[in-house]
């Protein structure tokens, strides 16, 4: 596959719910961009995820009018050569050095790009949200992550491997807590809560225990518990004390991660950018946002807290341009061109 406008960077942001992919020229010009289903190796498997990346890369070129016809799913012969000089792949689940090496080797075998750069999706969010490339990012989508980068380049990141690494949060954590509270309220082990009806209703069921049995029996994917995150916040806003407790716990966990990371970077007195990225931060629950910001400010008074205002794939593209030594003007142009509106839904 070739494109007349030379693609310097293939930028990829892979989450557990979606994949954003963009082809970018060396001067920051956007060649094409698409949004498709998740290509996460954790969600769909490594080979299927790579097949999706090939399909999406082909579509990104086709969006610009320069690419070939879309290949059949899994058609690995559709790529006679690299589509870009460098590929910046920012992937959910690229959490350990071993993950990064394994993913880089697998991506390299597909021949999508001449040079492969693999990072975690938190790296993309931080690079997109912090213009100078340093600060802290809290990622709270289906899962949870925290990354901090010092102005000198030193990085601190949480393991982000769930309860086995001391982490709690994300949509899945909220959903699991909501289900547990609904079950305990129903059987008398805990206080009554409006979620006793709302939790099963989300999945077309009637009782909380039906949700448990559906997950246990393989009829309902456990990852779908993340769908309960908006339900938790909605019930919390209605005055349900149990739901409010879960939302407060999430705010405290997120703030604690940010403050601890900033302390480890020895930046407590600095005006540290703290970027909030991920679907959970789109909640309209004001108490959650107030509590989160207050907890961070209590530990880092000069922290500059802001929600990420651009797609994280912008950060992946910037990391690729950084690797190429592109001038700042290229990044400025990219930020203007690579917007949510330019991410064409994959067909």
Q: What are these language model-derived features?
A:
Residues 94-197, 343-346:
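Phosphate-binding/catalytic loop of phosphoryl-transfer enzymes
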Residues 1-68, 75-84, 108-109, 128-134, ...:
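ATP-binding/phosphotransfer module of carbohydrate and carboxylate kinases, centering on a glycine-rich
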Residues 46, 87-92, 99-100:
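N-terminal functional module of multi-domain proteins
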């Amino acid at each position: 596959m070739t494109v007349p406008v030379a693609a310097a960077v293939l930028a990829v942001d892979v989450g557990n719910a979606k994949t954003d992919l963009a082809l970018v020229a060396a001067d920051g010009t956007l060649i094409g961009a698409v949004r498709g289903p998740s290509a996460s190796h954790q969600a769909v498997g490594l080979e299927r995820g790579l097949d999706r990346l090939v399909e999406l890369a082909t579509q990104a070129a086709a969006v610009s009018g320069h690419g070939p016809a879309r290949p059949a799913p899994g058609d690995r012969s559709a790529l006679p050569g690299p589509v870009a000089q460098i590929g910046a792949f920012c992937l959910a689940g690229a959490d350990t050095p071993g993950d990064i090496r394994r993913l880089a080797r697998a991506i390299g075998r597909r021949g999508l790009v001449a040079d492969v750069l693999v990072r975690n999706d938190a790296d993309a969010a931080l690079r997109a949200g912090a213009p100078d490339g340093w600060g802290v990012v809290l990622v709270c989508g289906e899962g949870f992550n925290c990354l901090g980068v010092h102005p000198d380049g030193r990085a601190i990141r949480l393991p982000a491997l769930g309860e086995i690494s001391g982490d709690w949060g994300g949509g899945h954590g909220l959903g699991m807590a909501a289900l547990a509270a609904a079950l305990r309220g129903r059987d008398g082990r805990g206080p009554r809560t409006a979620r006793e009806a709302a939790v099963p209703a989300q999945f077309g069921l009637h009782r909380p225990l039906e949700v448990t049995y559906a997950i246990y029996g393989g009829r309902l994917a456990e990852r779908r518990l993340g769908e309960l995150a908006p339900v938790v916040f909605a019930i919390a806003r209605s005055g349900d004390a149990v739901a409010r407790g879960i939302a407060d716990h999430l705010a405290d966990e997120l703030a604690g991660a940010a403050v601890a990371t900033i302390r480890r970077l020895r930046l407590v007195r600095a005006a540290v950018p703290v970027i909030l990225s991920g679907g959970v931060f789109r909640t309209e629950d004001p108490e959650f946002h107030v509590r989160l910001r207050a907890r961070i400010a209590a530990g880092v008074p000069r922290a500059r807290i802001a929600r990420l205002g651009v797609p994280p794939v912008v950060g992946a593209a910037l990391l690729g341009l950084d690797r190429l030594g592109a001038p700042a003007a290229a990044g400025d142009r990219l930020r203007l061109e690579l917007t949510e509106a330019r991410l064409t839904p994959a067909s």
